[in-house]
Design a protein with these regions (language model features):
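Catalytic alpha/beta core domains of metabolic enzymes, predominantly
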Residues: 1-60
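C-terminal alpha-helical cap/extension of soluble enzyme domains
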Residues: 39-165
């Protein structure tokens, strides 16, 4: 009895509306295409248990950050997040938030929120993640299934691997 599931890599849907919104906010994302939700849903019964959709998250977060600075132009000169804005403007072809968030990497890595400007920016990052993932959790029929996932600590998982389980 071996239990396993397959992972669908590179399976982002790349929502066109988000790409269009990024470009309307000054981005320059070209030739961005994804896999349709219907195709991904058709793969689930074939043993797919994890669908990697990181590109969708990156797009939604980048769009939200661009929108934040468009709606709050005074934040462009913020001591703590102004450099994030400058990177967004300098790297118009990028959509990976890691390219823009380097000035506040302590926040990204450790959750350190030094001021209200960083807190406000992180709020729109969180909303982008929830928008991208929330939609797909519902579409893939996974809503309400989190309690079914067995919780295991890193140490417990390491022990399982040592035992070959």
């Amino acid at each position: 009895g071996i239990f396993g599931v397959l992972v669908s890599h590179g399976s982002s849907t790349v929502p066109k509306y988000i790409v269009d919104e990024i470009n309307a906010l000054g981005g320059n994302i070209q030739n961005a295409y994804g896999i349709s939700i219907d195709e991904l849903k058709a793969a689930i019964p074939c043993g797919i248990g994890k669908i990697n959709v990181d590109t969708d998250i990156r797009l939604a977060v980048t769009r939200n950050m661009k929108e934040f600075f468009a709606n709050h132009p005074e934040k462009r000169e913020s001591q703590s997040i102004g450099e994030v804005y400058r990177l967004l403007e300098a790297k118009k072809e990028q959509f990976d938030p890691r390219a823009f968030l380097t000035p506040i990497m302590d926040t990204v890595m450790y959750g350190i929120i030094p001021d209200e400007d960083v807190a406000a920016l992180m709020a729109v990052v969180e909303k982008g993640v929830k928008e991208a993932i929330g939609t797909l959790i519902v579409e893939f029929g996974s809503y309400g299934k989190a309690p079914l996932v067995e919780m295991a600590s890193l140490d417990e998982m390491a022990e399982r691997y040592r035992k070959g389980l």
